[in-house]
Amino acid sequence: MAHASTHPAHPLPPVAPRRLLLAQRLLRGEGSVEVTAFRAGETLTTAVHGVSADGRLVVAHVPNLLGSLGAFHTPAPLDVRVDVLRDALDLTLPTRLASVHLLGTLRWCRDSAEVAELGLRGRVADLVADVGPRVRVGVVETQRILLHDVDGVAVFCCHTLPLTSRGLVDQAELADLADDVLGTAPEVLADLADAVALGLLPGESTPLQVDTELLPESPANALDADEAGVTLLRVRDGESTAVHVALPGAGRLDHSPRHAWRRLLDAIPARVAHP
């Protein structure tokens, strides 16, 4: 994603790899995107986003008679704010998992040949294939990216946040993992969260400021799942905690998140599951 020509004078604090992965996922196409031309005060809320083959942030929009591009209809580079919002995996939770925010410059592709050179994948590629030349596709250049998640705020420079799609875990595998996690009994999810809190399984816990009266009556719910681990919302004694449970084998070339999740369930310590 492009890419400041100079590095910042003061290096940014390091960020946990799982948060880096979350920011990458959102920018690669997860969640919903809003693109605002902040000088004109206009916002595209029906755009889709993803990345090019070389890791640049791409947005696409289909103008129509009811929702034209307005201030976005310009061949000149446009100053924009991009917001990507991602809800919790369990949609019964009134909780947003994370959001990514950036200021940058949007430049629309001039023709279909320039779009083809981007090497698009995912939802943006599907939209271009389905709608054809009516789709406006643009590339967003930025220097810094802000991530808001359950751990707080993290700031990334683009050169530390590679977005190329090469080497990604198969999306069907991750969809199956999400289904498996959502299909796991809340009591079992609670056992996993408690095992992390007791130091019996690898992971991290972060207290949350959430009104537990607004949450479902469940000891634990799924906030997120990816190749690195599963993030759970644990509610106990009127307090809520986000617990990231690391998946065994994450980072290995033969890593299967779905199989790792099953191994993790088998590894729940007996003293947690059967006190």
Explain the meaning of each model-derived region.
Residues 57-61, 102, 107, 138-140, ...:
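Short hydrophobic-aromatic micro-motifs
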Residues 2-73:
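An N-terminal domain-cap segment
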Residues 36-40, 85, 233-235:
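A generic structural motif
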